Curated annotation (Swiss-Prot):
Pathway: Amino-acid degradation; L-histidine degradation into L-glutamate; N-formimidoyl-L-glutamate from L-histidine: step 1/3. This is Histidine ammonia-lyase. It is found in: Cytoplasm. GO terms for cellular component: cytoplasm. It comes from Bradyrhizobium sp. (strain ORS 278). The gene is hutH. It is an enzyme of class 4 (lyase). There is a cross-link at residues 142-144 (5-imidazolinone (Ala-Gly)). It catalyses: L-histidine = trans-urocanate + NH4(+). NCBIfam families: hutH, PRK09367.1. One of its GO terms (biological process) is L-histidine catabolic process to glutamate and formate.
Length: 515
């Protein structure tokens, strides 16, 4: 995959998704002069008599301690080593790579005061597959993601640990394996590298990418459930959505209509159906999935903006030569965005679980056998699969509680309000795993329901989706070991197979975009 030439301030959602998928990133040539100009301002300040935070002073509560010029390099090294306090399992490699890319973008804005060789080192590590071991826990999202970014920076200076070709080795060995030497940090460079929101933002973006794919899958399984339940598609008509006007609702209604279009099941009950209205889990899909889409779209705007931002402290104003302390490291926007994503994930699971419950209940599923097994009683069918979906939804509901309201003072009360953005973003991945299983269960249940509607068939798009499922999981004719079926269905959901199959049948990309 070719490297993306980054224009800091203008990196797109799709660019970030490509980095998450494995692309490297390189700073565009037009941005180097500003990087070097900011570094020159810092170098001059380091030799001056005036105290400048993080350049010739201590850090945090120790900012009043002056550091002589001959100890500024040691100051930065000590900062990195002392801040490597992360705990817990390793952050997944795609997220670490995205974090490094975000740091390159931030430094490339030319307001951090680092030398070119610092950015070059990050670019080389990213391009050559040096992935620092970054523990998942230890950041409160202000003053930036200090501990996680310190673990990244430790590898740059030959310390810490990194993965190379799947092996965890000492940082110096990892660099040598790809022909790199450790760098020596100059004034402010350690602080610029660890002060920022890149860990939280990378985790939140990764959660957003997964949420986008899960939303698309939920639209597909929601359409399958509509046909399996012989529900009405009239509530999806564009006139209904337009009268409310929310963009996500309009898009969701359109997708649901396109997916079911041409279904013989639908045509079979256009007339003579005594039911006046369907349950909300079927009828209100545009309103719920659409609201989730709008939340994800808003979160995408916030996170793309943050990905292009300068979030360390202090910042260098090249035009005036000033070095100004601020608070861009506070990750409240990221925490809010992560909380929004969590709400969307939770509600997509909530309504999917209700559709599953509707389809397995003979009082609600309009003529299908109990728990969708041809021989109920002897067989239990999808009885406990629905219970599993309920259990997973309950977990996600608890995880969806906002993390951004849970501040606690740190650093001798100097950092007295924090965002908890890292925790807010990390929990998205457990939620996404749960949601993939919930939607996977709906896929199994709805496909079974449609196949029990013979001789009537579903639409071309939904038939293609069922075909993709059946290449991995056969229909449930009698009880069997179910865990493998659930795992395979969840993998199809998480991997985007449902939307791809539908798009091939439709001959176009019918699903909404976030960026």
């Amino acid at each position: 995959m070719n490297a993306i030439i980054a224009e800091p301030g203008h990196v797109s959602f799709d660019d970030l998704a490509r980095v998450y998928a494995g692309a490297a990133i390189a700073l565009g040539p037009a941005y180097w002069p500003r990087v070097e100009a900011a570094a020159a301002i810092v170098a001059k300040a380091a030799q001056g008599a005036e105290p400048v935070y993080g350049i010739n002073t201590g850090f945090g509560k120790l900012a009043s301690k002056r550091i002589p010029p001959d100890q500024t390099a040691l100051l930065q090294r000590n900062l990195i080593l002392s801040h490597c306090c992360g705990v817990g399992p390793a952050t997944p490699e795609p997220i670490v790579r995205l974090m490094i890319a975000l740091k390159i973008i931030s430094l490339g804005r030319g307001a951090s005061g680092v030398r070119r060789q610092i950015v070059d080192q990050l670019q080389a590590m990213l391009a050559q597959g040096v992935c620092p071991f970054v523990p998942q826990q230890g950041s409160v999202g202000a003053s930036g993601d200090l501990a996680p970014l310190a673990h990244m920076t430790a590898v740059m200076i030959g310390e810490g640990q990194a993965f190379v070709e799947g092996r965890l080795v000492p940082g110096r060995e990892a660099l040598a394996h790809v022909g790199l030497d450790p760098v020596t940090l100059g004034p402010k460079e350690g602080l610029a590298l660890i002060n920022g929101t890149q860990f939280s933002t990378a985790y939140a973006l990764a959660g957003l990418f997964r949420a986008r794919d899960l939303l698309n899958a939920a639209l597909v399984t929601g359409a399958l459930s509509v046909d399996a339940a012989m529900a009405s598609t009239a509530p999806f008509r564009p006139e209904i959505q337009a009268l409310r006007g929310h963009p996500g609702q309009i898009a969701a209604g359109r997708v649901l209509t396109e997916l079911v279009d041409g279904s013989a099941i639908r045509l079979s009950h256009l007339e003579g159906d005594e039911r006046v209205q369907d349950p909300y889990c079927l009828r209100c899909q545009p309103q719920v999935a659409g609201a989730a889409l709008d939340l994800l779209t808003q979160a995408a705007r916030t996170l793309v903006n943050e990905a292009n931002a300068v979030t360390d402290n202090p910042l260098v104003l090249v035009e005036t030569g000033e070095i100004i302390s601020g608070g861009n490291f506070h990750a409240e926007p990221v925490a809010f965005a992560a909380d929004q994503i969590a709400l969307a994930l939770s509600e997509l699971g909530a309504i999917s679980e209700r559709r599953i419950a509707t389809l397995v209940d003979p009082a609600l599923n309009f003529g299908l056998p109990p728990f969708l097994t041809p021989q109920p009683g002897l067989n239990s069918g999808f009885m406990i699969a629905e219970v599993t979906a309920a259990a997973l939804f309950a977990e996600n509901k608890q995880r969806a509680l906002p993390c951004s309201i849970d501040s606690t003072p740190t650093s001798a009360n100097q950092e007295d309000h924090v965002s908890m953005a890292a925790h807010a973003a990390r929990r998205l991945h457990d939620m996404a795993d749960n949601l993939a299983h919930i939607i996977g269960i709906e896929l199994l249940v709805a496909a079974q329901g449609i196949e029990l509607r013979v001789p009537h068939g579903t639409s071309a798009a939904l038939s293609a989706v069922i075909g993709a499922l059946r290449s991995h999981v056969p229909a449930l004719e009698s009880d069997r070991y179910m865990a493998d079926d659930l795992a395979k269905a969840a993998a199809l959901v998480a991997g985007g197979a449902l939307a791809r199959a539908a798009n091939v049948a439709l001959g176009r990309d019918s699903f909404p975009r976030l960026g």
